[in-house]
């Protein structure tokens, strides 16, 4: 059955023997993260890797608070979260389900159309459902800011974790951040860390290539156009992770294009009006597992995350209107933070101990001003800790990998399988198996990946033949070591890189490497015969299979 909320999920984890309740006093300052880190690395490399989920019930400095961690931290829990608990289930089943959602077969006859109706009806039943505030558990307790007519809010009452010694402060690490496209009014749900500055404000780690950052840039363009009083004015922001942290405005007139200007050359009144503009934001913390997971899924722009969550859990997500902003949030979340980001306002964010295993250093990011906090009675705070792999996000990343496969195959159908090794923190290495059909096919795949959404950040791409199991890193290593001539088969290019990449020559820009480890063809300039790989005779394999147990070797 689908999990209605985080509490249903916790009950299931408890019932399945996947939860440990910690009643010893533990501090959210470094101590919880150390326990979660050690737990995530238990039985590393085995089928039982990841340890149990952790429910802290005695949080130092926060009487009555509870904190859930490592909820996605094992293969079994990741499958449970996505309703895949049969012994024969694997995360590959997620890819099959996603294909139905994003790419139903085109009907070619009336009979095919009739067969498609039940599938369309099923997908239609997963769209989010708006319910009234009185039925929304997240509205059980409401705190409004003084500006909103309330008695005030205090984010510091939440047991937000500081996870590593050099972190810039406590960070909210498992939020579902809701924004709205100012051009289309479509909602987006993403996951971005939030540094807590004080009781009313946080940072918003909106890297420039993320959807929420694009929403803010669009909102900034609109505000700038209105401020300058000319409908032909277009504004572009070079902000989000850019250490210059400036707004460049390009004025277009009938006489041509004016050069970009520094903010200091823009009239003060104009910049003031831009900064006074706002973009509304809402944050849900502690949702059901499918909703939390949907916030990190690389969804096509036309597919809303709430729909994906409903599809994954087999039941629509119930939403409720916010109190102070025009956004809809999961009705049964543990906490809801409502507020706004001021256009043009930036503040230092970081450092932060990141999933790369290194600190992400300080930079300038938008500031989230909270106008209202609503929560359930006796709320449960959900958090994660990232660091040197393997961590909880390794299993979340593996599920994303399985969802990413059918999305890639829409554009590159010759892809057979893909692997994003957690040791390479996902965006640093992608291994791809393809059905090779022509000379240079592997290079076409590399360039296609670097042109595809969030895959553009991939630092290294390895392409192998379809008979290579990309999930077996030993086999991949064998193919790479034996199948390449380094000068011939390694390709370098320049392009955007992840903001977390501390090794790139410039922030957000650097080099990438592609390795063609496929068999080489005469059309690719290989003139010698390509040797066959070793393989035992099938008759011998079958005979020894039947004899193996009797030999008692293992």
Which residues fall in each region the model found?
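Intrinsic disorder/low-complexity segments
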Residues: 222-269, 273
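Extended, highly charged
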Residues: 1-224, 262, 266-554
């Amino acid at each position: 059955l689908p999990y209605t909320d985080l509490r249903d999920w916790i009950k299931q984890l408890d019932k399945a023997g996947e939860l440990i309740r910690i009643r010893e006093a533990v501090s959210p300052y470094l101590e919880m993260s150390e326990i979660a880190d050690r737990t995530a690395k238990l039985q590393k490399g085995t089928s039982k890797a990841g340890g149990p989920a952790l429910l802290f019930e005695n949080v130092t400095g926060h009487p009555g608070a509870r904190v859930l961690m490592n909820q996605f931290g094992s293969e079994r829990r990741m499958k449970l979260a996505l309703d895949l608990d049969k012994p024969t289930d694997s995360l590959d089943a997620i890819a099959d389900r996603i294909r139905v959602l994003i790419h139903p077969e085109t009907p070619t006859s009336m009979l095919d159309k009739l067969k498609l109706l039940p599938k369309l009806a099923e997908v239609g039943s997963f769209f989010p459902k708006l319910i009234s505030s009185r039925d929304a558990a997240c509205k059980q307790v409401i705190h409004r800011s003084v500006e909103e007519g309330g008695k005030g809010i205090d984010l510091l009452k939440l047991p937000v974790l500081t996870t590593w010694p050099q972190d810039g402060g406590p960070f909210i690490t498992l939020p579902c951040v809701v924004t709205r496209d100012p051009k289309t009014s479509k909602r987006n749900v993403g996951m971005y860390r939030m540094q807590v500055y004080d009781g009313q404000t946080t940072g918003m780690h909106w890297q420039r290539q993320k959807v929420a950052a694009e929403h803010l840039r669009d909102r900034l363009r609109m505000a700038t156009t209105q401020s300058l009083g000319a409908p032909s004015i277009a504004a572009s922001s070079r902000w989000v992770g850019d250490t210059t942290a400036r707004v460049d405005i390009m004025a277009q007139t009938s006489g041509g294009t004016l050069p970009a200007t520094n903010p200091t050359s823009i009239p003060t009144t104009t910049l003031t009006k831009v900064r006074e503009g706002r973009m509304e934001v809402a944050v849900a913390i502690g949702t059901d597992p499918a909703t939390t997971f949907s916030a990190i899924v690389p969804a096509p722009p036309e597919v809303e995350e709430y729909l994906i969550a409903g599809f994954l859990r087999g039941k629509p997500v119930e939403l409720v209107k916010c109190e102070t902003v025009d956004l809809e949030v999961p009705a049964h979340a543990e906490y809801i933070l409502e507020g706004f980001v001021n256009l043009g306002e930036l503040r230092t964010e970081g450092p932060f101990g990141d999933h790369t295993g290194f600190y992400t250093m300080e930079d300038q990011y938008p500031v989230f001003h909270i106008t209202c906090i609503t929560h359930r009675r006796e709320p449960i705070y959900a958090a994660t800790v990232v660091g040197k792999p393997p961590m909880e996000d390794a299993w979340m990343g593996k599920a994303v990998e399985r969802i990413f496969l059918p999305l890639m195959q829409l554009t590159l159908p010759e892809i057979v399988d893909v692997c994003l090794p957690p040791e390479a923190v996902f965006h640093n290495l992608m291994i791809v198996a393809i059905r090779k059909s022509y000379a240079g096919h592997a290079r076409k795949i590399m360039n296609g990946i670097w042109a595809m959404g969030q895959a553009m950040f991939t630092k290294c791409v390895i392409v192998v033949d379809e008979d290579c199991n990309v999930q077996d890193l030993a086999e991949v290593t064998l193919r790479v070591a034996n199948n390449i001539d380094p000068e011939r088969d390694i390709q370098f290019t320049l392009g955007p890189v992840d903001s977390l990449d501390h090794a790139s020559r410039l922030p957000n820009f650097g080099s990438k490497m592609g390795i063609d480890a496929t068999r080489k063809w005469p059309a690719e300039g290989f003139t010698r015969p390509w040797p066959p790989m070793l393989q035992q005779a099938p008759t011998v394999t079958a005979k020894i299979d039947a004899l193996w147990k009797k030999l008692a070797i293992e």
